[in-house]
């Protein structure tokens, strides 16, 4: 019996030594990930993190940070994502493995968990995506006074050049927030259109500006149009929130004494007015008609403001490009609204020599001369 016990211990010792040797051999044979594999892993991790961040921001801006639903969704999404990312560090081979079968079981367990977590996260994210795109803009919220009316119009049956606009804003501003409200009705004659001015109002540094378009008339005062967010009572603007269906889009028709004064005086913004050159009369009229069409569209069906795709500047560019027969080239400055005047200068929409002495103006001179 002593001999059998000795033999058994010898075999056990030999087995352990062989297992250790096998583990060491597997470790040595384990290939190191290539730079391509590392890059793919990195891109997958970044994609997961960005997709989760997008969904969380959408929930936060729709329901508010203090909402219980926001926090429950945050905990669930972060938990699933953390568990999914942690599977990368699951041990596939360890020195404490007792057999090859257990090693295979370990590997299968990791793969199963990874697939399960990917399925759960993908389902949650797709449900969130569907929820986000199902959010509809509304017309019947508690709006701030400056955007609570929608411009509409009627065309004279006998003279189609005569347009009667209803709800033209003509406020008397005392402070940035206080004003005496006036919503006027005004009739204009499209045959008397004489030109276009573009106003840039800088409120957040040199890169970001609010853009307005004013139409000049031969025998009447200008009329301005402005695409803006339709703020609710107590609401403030956030560029980041503008990506997440937080604000409806509003088109304001206003007198310049209202819509420019409130920015240059009441709010203390830096405002510049640029007269546009090289536009034919039919192009000016077509651009005005585009605003009327936009008013019809927004009255029929509200739309979302988007910081990148449908803001105060690029909507104007989309319309202007159509009426000019695609004469205006695409440019990154369409999305960097503070540099829009430089774009207009480069494409010849600002007169290079606006004075009678024909002395050319640089862009710096334009900024100096057009500051309000």
Write out the residue ranges for each language-model feature.
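Active-site nucleophile-His-acid catalytic modules used for acyl/amide transfer and hydrolysis
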Residues: 254-335
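Intrinsic-disorder-associated, low-complexity terminal segments enriched in Asp/Asn/His/Tyr and depleted
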Residues: 7, 18-20, 100, 104
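Glycine-rich catalytic cores of cysteine/serine-nucleophile enzymes that process amide/ester linkages
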Residues: 163, 174-271
